[in-house]
């Protein structure tokens, strides 16, 4: 069982390391231009941006930890403490594109590299659902890369349904993103 805790300002450096390491591991092959990748990661993982987000009332970051150290050699990432499994970022009350209702926007859900397939993602996702329901959120939605079939299958298995496609554009490429959503008001709270 994971320990899932709400991140604090003091966690900004850890979140920055987790974000940079995880994003590079999972998505660097999808970028045509490595300079654009570097710029994107630099902006997303900047400690200043993370602190600003942590200080924003509707933004919530969660860190998933194990009771014991995971073998660091297995992950290959010695800059991340051995008990860290992953993290997520959500934003409450976000308008779903082309809809007239709001919900939790699941902005990030990343596991430390090489720790997928162990049901950690399920626990973190379920925590987000419960957190949203406790705060009266009726919907959960996210954007997922079309070229990330593993994540799409995971979210579909968790009850997320395709809503529409949007385009993410950088200077040199475009990527299709699926918007997926789940009605939280149909789920009984435990």
Residue ranges and their predicted role:
Residues 118, 135-138:
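Short coil/turn segments at alpha/beta junctions that flank glycine-rich nucleotide-binding fingerprints
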């Amino acid at each position: 069982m994971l320990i899932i805790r709400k991140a604090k300002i003091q966690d900004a450096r850890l979140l920055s390391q987790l974000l940079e390491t995880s994003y590079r591991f999972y998505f660097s092959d999808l970028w045509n231009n490595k300079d654009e990748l570097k710029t994107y990661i630099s902006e997303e993982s900047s400690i200043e941006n993370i602190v600003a987000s942590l200080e924003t009332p509707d933004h919530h970051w969660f860190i998933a930890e194990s009771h014991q150290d995971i073998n660091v050699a297995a992950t290959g990432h010695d800059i991340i403490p051995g008990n860290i499994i992953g993290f997520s970022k959500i934003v409450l009350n976000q308008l779903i594109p082309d809809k007239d209702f709001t919900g939790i926007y699941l902005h990030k859900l990343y596991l430390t590299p090489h720790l997928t397939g162990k049901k950690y993602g399920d626990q973190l996702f379920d925590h987000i659902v419960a957190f949203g329901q406790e705060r009266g959120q009726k919907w959960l939605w996210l954007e997922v890369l079309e070229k990330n079939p593993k994540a799409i299958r995971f979210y579909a298995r968790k009850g997320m349904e395709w809503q529409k496609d949007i385009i993410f554009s950088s200077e040199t490429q475009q990527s299709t993103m699926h918007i997926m959503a789940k009605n939280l008001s149909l789920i009984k709270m435990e």
